[in-house]
């Protein structure tokens, strides 16, 4: 994030040489062994960050389970972390180990602007994701219909524009004085207004919004869970389905007890025996022809013929009633399947919301110490001094956050875990 220097009117410091008490050094104090160790450690951090976030991008773009458009936010967030690892951390490391800025004034200006932009965009992304979660919970049907890939991409563009508006204007007033032209420093001014502006705009304000939104999401989810549990306890709830099931069981019991003269084929003419009605009608026609060919039929025969025809009509009515009950049963079954799919989708949404809450919590934990000490220095300067090694630790812990999101996805989300395994297995097979 803010790879800044803190320059007062009397002194100027690089970010790595800053101490809130006002002490600074313009040359590196690291031994060769320490330089090698730090370079190796940070190089591993850079590589891990790039590989992990590239996996996130590939997983979202190729995995069917990760296709929902809201996951495009994670692609954009991972892209910001990749840019931090490639364009910011290497130059911060060189500045730390060398003790001065080696890469010229033009790149210094670009480097500072991008550093502020990428960290600001990370937290604004998380803020947008929290709002997306909130709308999907409170306006599930309407918002899910509106949440198309095109709309999400538009929201991502807005996130980057907001980040640029927060980050770039103060950079116009940067002080670029150097203590020694032979050892130039890449630095911003440390005026109180800028420190507070950047801290509030880039961290504290989005962080407060994000936390409040997630508290609201938790409240809504808790209320819904309580309402659902009350509905389950309600004896009148869902009485339609038991009645259908009882009706079917009564029909089955009547058939078993011999009360139904029709064959089992009557129960599902539409599904298993589509020609049942046709067979009934053809048999009745044959009976009619036989009765016409018989001469001088007796009264007994006529009575039996009427009984047969009434029995056939009764059987046909039963068949139609049974068909209707089966249609009703199949529609109920389809409805149950739809409900179960919705429950699976809701469970996935809950898991995803939990994962994003972990991502946001880790981000706050990683960056809060830096911004707190940075703001404290801007307000009260020397009286609020913290040890220089501690400030450097806070500074680099913030950068480490860029590598943690893929780890969080792997630990807490099964869809990401499967996607990562599939990608890595394919890469492994191709290499052999």
UniProtKB/Swiss-Prot annotation:
UniProt subcellular location: Cell membrane
UniProt-recorded Gene Ontology molecular function terms: alpha2-adrenergic receptor activity; epinephrine binding
Entry-linked SUPFAM superfamilies: Family A G protein-coupled receptor-like
Pfam families noted in UniProt: 7tm_1
Topological type in the membrane: Multi-pass membrane protein
PROSITE patterns, A to Z: G_PROTEIN_RECEP_F1_1 (PS00237), G_PROTEIN_RECEP_F1_2 (PS50262)
GO CC terms: plasma membrane
Extracellular domain ranges by topology: 1-35, 99-108, 176-191, 380-392
UniProt keywords, alphabetically: Cell membrane, Disulfide bond, G-protein coupled receptor, Glycoprotein, Membrane, Receptor, Transducer, Transmembrane, Transmembrane helix
Biased composition (Acidic residues): 272-283
Basic and acidic residues bias (residue ranges): 227-236, 248-258
Gene Ontology annotations of biological process type: adenylate cyclase-inhibiting adrenergic receptor signaling pathway; G protein-coupled receptor signaling pathway; platelet activation; regulation of smooth muscle contraction; regulation of vasoconstriction
Region Disordered, residue ranges: 1-28, 224-342
Site label Implicated in catechol agonist binding and receptor activation, positions: 198, 202
Family in the record: Belongs to the G-protein coupled receptor 1 family. Adrenergic receptor subfamily. ADRA2C sub-subfamily.
Job description of the protein: Alpha-2 adrenergic receptors mediate the catecholamine-induced inhibition of adenylate cyclase through the action of G proteins. The order of potency for this receptor is dexmedetomidine > norepinephrine > epinephrine.
Protein name: Alpha-2C adrenergic receptor
Lineage, broadest ranks: Eukaryota, Metazoa, Chordata, Craniata, Vertebrata
Gene field: adra2c
């Amino acid at each position: 994030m803010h790879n800044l220097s803190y320059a007062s009117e009397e002194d100027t410091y690089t970010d790595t040489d800053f101490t809130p008490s006002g002490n600074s050094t313009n040359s590196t104090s690291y031994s060769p062994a320490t330089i090698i160790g730090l370079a190796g450690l940070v190089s591993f951090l850079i590589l891990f960050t790039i590989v992990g976030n590239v996996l996130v991008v590939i997983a979202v773009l190729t995995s069917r389970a990760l296709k929902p458009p809201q996951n495009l936010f994670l692609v954009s967030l991972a892209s910001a972390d990749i840019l931090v690892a490639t364009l910011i951390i290497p130059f911060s490391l060189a500045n730390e180990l060398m003790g001065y800025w080696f890469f010229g004034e033009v790149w210094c200006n670009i480097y500072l602007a991008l550093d502020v932009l990428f960290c600001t965009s990370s937290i604004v992304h998380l803020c947008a994701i929290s709002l997306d979660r909130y709308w999907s919970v409170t306006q599930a049907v309407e918002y899910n219909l509106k949440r198309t890939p095109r709309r999400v991409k538009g929201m991502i563009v807005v996130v980057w524009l907001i980040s640029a508006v927060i980050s770039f204007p103060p950079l116009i007033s940067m002080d670029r004085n150097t203590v020694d032209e032979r050892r130039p420093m890449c630095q911003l001014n440390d005026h109180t207004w800028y420190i507070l502006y950047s801290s509030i705009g880039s961290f504290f304000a989005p962080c407060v919004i994000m936390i409040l939104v997630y508290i609201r999401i938790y409240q809504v989810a808790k209320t819904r869970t309580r309402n659902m549990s009350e509905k389950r306890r309600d004896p009148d709830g869902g009485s339609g389905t038991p009645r259908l099931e009882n009706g079917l069981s009564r029909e089955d019991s009547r058939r078993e007890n011999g009360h139904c003269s029709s064959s089992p084929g009557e129960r599902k003419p539409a599904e298993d025996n589509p020609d049942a009605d046709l067979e009934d009608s053809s048999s009745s026609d044959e009976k009619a022809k036989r009765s016409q060919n018989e001469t001088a039929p007796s009264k007994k025969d006529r009575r039996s013929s009427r009984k047969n025809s009434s029995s056939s009509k009764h059987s046909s009515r039963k068949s139609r009633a049974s068909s209707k009950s089966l249609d009703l049963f199949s529609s109920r079954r389809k409805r149950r399947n739809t409900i179960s799919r919705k429950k699976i989708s809701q469970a996935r949404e809950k898991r995803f919301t939990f994962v994003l809450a972990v991502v946001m919590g880790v981000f706050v934990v990683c960056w809060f110490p830096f911004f707190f000490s940075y703001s404290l220095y801007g307000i009260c300067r020397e009286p609020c001094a913290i040890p220089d090694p501690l400030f450097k630790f806070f500074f680099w812990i913030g950068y480490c956050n860029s590598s943690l999101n893929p780890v969080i996805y792997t630990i807490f989300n099964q869809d990401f875990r499967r996607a990562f395994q599939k990608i890595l297995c394919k890469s492994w097979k191709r290499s052999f």
